[in-house]
């Protein structure tokens, strides 16, 4: 039986009194139908004696004086009444199959006087499963009905004192006056009994016996009208309390769910769950077709109508259910159709055992492995409510079935194993088959890979691996074929509110079949191996070659230097011509891409400094002619394959004469640095020495950059790198200054910088004439020995690794290897120009002697600068900060002998 309430939706909300009176009429009708399901006899109403009203009031007062403990004992004693026994061993009350005339139902709903007085001695015509019996006479202290419906709060005063002839009074005119008098009398009674009723109501609510009292009201004998409508508390306007009272009277008490969180109430795992630990009383099943009206349908009127929406579930649900998830067994005795047998412990409310901490240990509320099969630590008493409506939580109709076939949520098989039935279970099935509902067909396949274990397994197989990170219950695992569960399954926990997602181990990492056939524009190349097929970054962005003269993009090596086309043409015209260029400034004009045409004199000087000579062009032409002559001669004296081979060898030998090492040295060679000296001022000791110190610091910055760009230098230890630069900076500057003096002024003067050139006068003025003479002699050695630019570059790099501490460096072994490599490079450069080994050794001896001659000059300059630093405040010579630090810290180590140069020859 179902009661659908639609208050506040179609019609406006009635007044509170009328609202409460309407519910009282409704519940009185329900109560009378439950107690006396037979036809109504209006004659009993009129046959009531005139003094029945006073007798009922006396019974009501006596009933209120009884303690709640006596009422509870009386209620427990009612279970042995014939009315309670009439429910049968399984506790089913098939109210939806009562055969009642429509006229009697309409009379019970339409006439309010039928709800005032119960009819004793009425036989009931029961349906299936109910016996025709005579209800027991009412006890004097029977409070089943008032205690059950007392939660409704205050009763409607207009009906609380109605007499037996209320039907005649209401049909006459002017009946409202009588109702007002009755209302006043009722209010006086309420004031006297208010305190007792409030205490009784609190005890009833605290004991949580609302659902039990509603059941006893359905099976207890009828009581008097005043006992049913007797004392109550004040009228409450709160709709929440009214809804709570309605739910309690209908057996859907909300008090049992108030302690749950909103998420647990929405999840619904406390609904339709078999009571843990309850006695597994089972009755023989009726065929499924006979149970449609009472078990699987929504109400008594829907038992004969099988809609298309629920037809798949009703037709195949019993076949998909096996075992104790429902306490139902499949039997072929009842005509071969699927049958259900229901235990009496199937509860509508959440079991009290679920509140125990031990009951939640095996429950995962994120993956929903609703392990409800095991017995609880403390089995609760059997729950009285056994007649519930069975629903399939995954049966959402044909529309959902069509959409579910397209889902790809992965293999959700075998996530729950329901427990076996109790020891007294009469179910022939000892195991259950409970798994997640599949959302795809076997033909379509699945997007995710295997989840670590198949759905197969027998009952009691505890070795199955759960795909979602938790272990299955060891009992109740039914064998399944393949990885797909049966299409229809039963969830003991009720409606599942969210779909469990597979763990990361379940996600398929390989490409699917639809991707394997597509190789893409780059063939069968995988992303993880794509780096093996990518060319170096230099292939896409080659290092840009710049002109050594103006800094523009170089077009190649012209006249012995890497220059652009403009500087190539300029040098050819200027070197072959007879014009003399003079600088309008101080011979320190800036030559770049935009100002290279401003000063031809400085541009030509820079070309010579870069090593450009007309002889390099002539040597190149002679080399090409020689190769051509050798090729023509080989064509006459040898087969056709030999000329190509000889030409290739000749080209390789030519490339060896210009190794890559030299190209690097040419590219990293520092440019010309100006001292910033004012040549318009008269020369003085302080001015000249201050300009030299300023030039030394500027050149030191370029030396650091140049050293870091040398091949292999960065492989040294950081401390070794700093030490080598700080010890060799003076020798490097002297050697570079001698080369500039040789190339620019033919060693007649000391070419420190374009704006600082020392002649004889300045040499004397600087008070370092002896040191200047030795430096000029070094510059003349470049001319006497005819040092080439390639030899100069290699010798300069080797000079960097020619002075070390006596105690050695931190990585002395690697320093020695690096120094030896540069010596070999110098010997290779010498060998490229000379074919005679004797001349090569002589040349090597000359160059190494020249390198050894730099060290004594550098030592004299170290001593001079250190003495000058000490007397700088007296002679007004400025020392930049970095120069002062190096001279004050590192130079004393050299002068004291802690740091010594490495000589090629014995001194």
UniProtKB/Swiss-Prot annotation:
Family matches, as InterPro entries: Andrgn_rcpt, NHR-like_dom_sf, Nucl_hrmn_rcpt_lig-bd, Nuclear_hormone_rcpt_NR3, Znf_hrmn_rcpt, Znf_NHR/GATA
Biased amino acid composition, Polar residues: 123-134
Modification Phosphotyrosine occurs at: 228, 272, 310, 349, 360, 365-366, 396, 522, 539, 903
Domain NR LBD: 656-887
Cross-link Glycyl lysine isopeptide (Lys-Gly) (interchain with G-Cter in ubiquitin): residue positions: 833, 835
Region (Interaction with LPXN): 539-906
Chain intervals for the UniProt region annotation (Interaction with HIPK3): 559-649
PANTHER family in the cross-refs: KNIRPS-RELATED PROTEIN-RELATED (PTHR48092)
Cross-link (Glycyl lysine isopeptide (Lys-Gly) (interchain with G-Cter in SUMO)): 389, 508
Residue ranges of the region described as Interaction with ZNF318: 1-574
Subcellular location: Nucleus; Cytoplasm
Organism placement in taxonomy: Eukaryota, Metazoa, Chordata, Craniata, Vertebrata
Name under which the protein is recorded: Androgen receptor
Top-level taxonomic group: Eukaryota
Gene this protein is translated from: AR
Function in brief: Steroid hormone receptors are ligand-activated transcription factors that regulate eukaryotic gene expression and affect cellular proliferation and differentiation in target tissues. Transcription factor activity is modulated by bound coactivator and corepressor proteins like ZBTB7A that recruits NCOR1 and NCOR2 to the androgen response elements/ARE on target genes, negatively regulating androgen receptor signaling and androgen-induced cell proliferation. Transcription activation is also down-regulated by NR0B2. Activated, but not phosphorylated, by HIPK3 and ZIPK/DAPK3.
Organism per entry: Canis lupus familiaris (Dog)
Swiss-Prot/TrEMBL site (Interaction with coactivator LXXL and FXXFY motifs) positions: 708
A biological process term (GO) from this entry: intracellular receptor signaling pathway
Region (Modulating): 1-545
Record field: transmembrane: none
Sequence segments annotated as region (Disordered): 36-152, 200-231
Annotated site, Interaction with coactivator FXXLF and FXXFY motifs, chain positions: 885
Region entry Interaction with KAT7, spans: 612-906
């Amino acid at each position: 039986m179902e009661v659908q309430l639609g208050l506040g939706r179609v019609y406006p909300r009635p007044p509170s009194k009328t609202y409460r009176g309407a519910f009282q009429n409704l519940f009185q009708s329900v109560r009378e139908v439950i107690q006396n399901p037979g036809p109504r006899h209006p004659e009993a109403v009129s046959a009531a004696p005139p003094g029945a009203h006073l007798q009922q009031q006396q019974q009501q007062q006596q009933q209120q004086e009884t303690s709640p403990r006596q009422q509870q004992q009386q209620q427990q004693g009612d279970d042995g009444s014939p009315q309670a026994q009439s429910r049968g061993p399984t506790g089913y009350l098939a109210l939806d199959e009562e055969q009642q005339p429509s006229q009697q139902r309409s009379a019970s709903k339409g006439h309010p006087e039928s709800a005032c007085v119960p009819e004793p001695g009425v036989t009931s015509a029961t349906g299936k499963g109910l016996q025709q019996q005579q209800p027991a006479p009412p006890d004097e202290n029977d409070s089943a009905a008032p205690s059950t419906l007392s939660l409704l709060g205050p009763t409607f005063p207009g009906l609380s004192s109605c007499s037996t002839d209320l039907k005649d009074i209401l049909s006459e005119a002017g009946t409202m006056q009588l109702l007002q008098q009755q209302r006043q009398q009722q209010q006086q009674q309420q004031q006297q009994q208010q305190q007792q009723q409030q205490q009784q109501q609190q005890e009833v609510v605290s004991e949580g016996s609302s659902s039990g009292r509603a059941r006893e009201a359905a099976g207890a004998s009828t009581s008097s009208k005043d006992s049913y409508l007797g004392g109550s508390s004040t009228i409450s306007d709160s709709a929440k309390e009214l809804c709570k009272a309605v739910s309690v009277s209908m057996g859907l008490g909300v008090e049992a769910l108030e302690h749950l969180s909103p998420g647990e109430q929405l999840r619904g795992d406390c609904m339709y769950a078999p009571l843990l630990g309850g006695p597994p009383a089972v009755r023989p099943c009726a065929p499924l077709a006979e149970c449609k009206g009472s078990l699987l349908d929504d109400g008594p009127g829907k038992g004969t109508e099988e809609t298309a929406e629920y037809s798949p579930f009703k037709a195949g649900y019993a076949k998909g259910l096996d075992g104790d998830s429902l306490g139902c067994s499949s039997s072929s005795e009842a005509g071969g159709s699927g049958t259900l047998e229901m235990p009496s412990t199937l509860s509508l409310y959440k079991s009290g055992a679920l509140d125990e901490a031990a009951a939640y240990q095996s429950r995962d509320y994120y993956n929903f492995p609703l392990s409800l099969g095991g017995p609880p630590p403390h089995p609760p008493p059997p729950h009285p409510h056994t007649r519930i409506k069975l629903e399939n939580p995954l049966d959402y109709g044909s529309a959902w079935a069509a959409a579910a076939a397209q889902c790809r949520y992965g293999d959700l098989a075998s996530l729950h194993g329901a427990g076996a039935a109790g020891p007294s279970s009469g179910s022939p099935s000892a195991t259950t088959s409970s798994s997640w509902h599949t959302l795809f067909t076997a033909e379509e396949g699945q997007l995710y890979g295997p989840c670590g274990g198949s759905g197969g397994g027998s009952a009691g197989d505890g070795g199955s691996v759960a795909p979602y990170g938790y272990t299955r219950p060891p009992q109740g695992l039914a064998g399944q074929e393949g990885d797909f569960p049966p299409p229809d399954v039963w969830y003991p926990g009720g409606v599942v509110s969210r779909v469990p997602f597979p763990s990361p181990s379940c996600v398929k990492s390989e490409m699917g079949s639809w991707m394997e056939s597509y190789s893409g524009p780059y063939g069968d190349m995988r992303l993880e191996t794509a780096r093996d097929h990518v060319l170096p970054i230099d292939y896409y962005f080659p290092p840009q070659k710049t002109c050594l003269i103006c800094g523009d993009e170089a077009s190649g090596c012209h006249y012995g230097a890497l220059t652009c086309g403009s500087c190539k043409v300029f040098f050819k015209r200027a070197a072959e011509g007879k014009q003399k260029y003079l600088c309008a400034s101080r011979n320190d004009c800036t030559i770049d891409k935009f100002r290279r045409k401003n000063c031809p004199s400085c541009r030509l000087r820079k070309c010579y400094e870069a090593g450009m000579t007309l002889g390099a062009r002539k040597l190149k032409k002679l080399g090409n002619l020689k190769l051509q002559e050798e090729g023509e001669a080989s064509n006459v004296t040898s087969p056709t394959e030999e000329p190509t081979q000889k030409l290739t060898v000749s080209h390789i030998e030519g490339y060896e004469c210009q190794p890559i090492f030299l190209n690097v040295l040419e590219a990293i060679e520092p440019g010309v640095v100006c001292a910033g000296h004012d040549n318009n001022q008269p020369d003085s000791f302080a001015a000249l020495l201050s300009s030299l110190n300023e030039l030394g610091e500027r050149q030191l910055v370029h030396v650091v950059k140049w050293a870091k760009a040398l091949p292999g230098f960065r492989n040294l230890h950081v401390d070794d790198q700093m030490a080598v630069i700080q010890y060799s900076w003076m020798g490097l500057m002297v050697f570079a200054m001698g080369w500039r003096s040789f190339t620019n002024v033919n060693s007649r003067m000391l070419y420190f910088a374009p704006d600082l050139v020392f002649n004889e006068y300045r040499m004397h003025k600087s008070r370092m004439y002896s040191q200047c003479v030795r430096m000029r002699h070094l510059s003349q050695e470049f001319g006497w020995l005819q040092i080439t630019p390639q030899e100069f570059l290699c010798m300069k790099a080797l000079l960097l690794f020619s002075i070390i501490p006596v105690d050695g460096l931190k990585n002395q072994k690697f320093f020695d290897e690096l120094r030896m490599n540069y010596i070999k490079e110098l010997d290779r450069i010498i060998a490229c120009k000379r074919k005679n080994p004797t001349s090569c050794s002589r040349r090597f001896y000359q160059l190494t002697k020249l390198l050894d001659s730099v060290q004594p000059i550098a030592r004299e300059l170290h001593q001079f600068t250190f003495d000058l630093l000490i007397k700088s405040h007296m002679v007004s010579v400025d020392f930049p900060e970095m120069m002062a630090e190096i001279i004050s810290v590192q130079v004393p180590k050299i002068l004291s002998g802690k740091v010594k140069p490495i000589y090629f020859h014995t001194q």
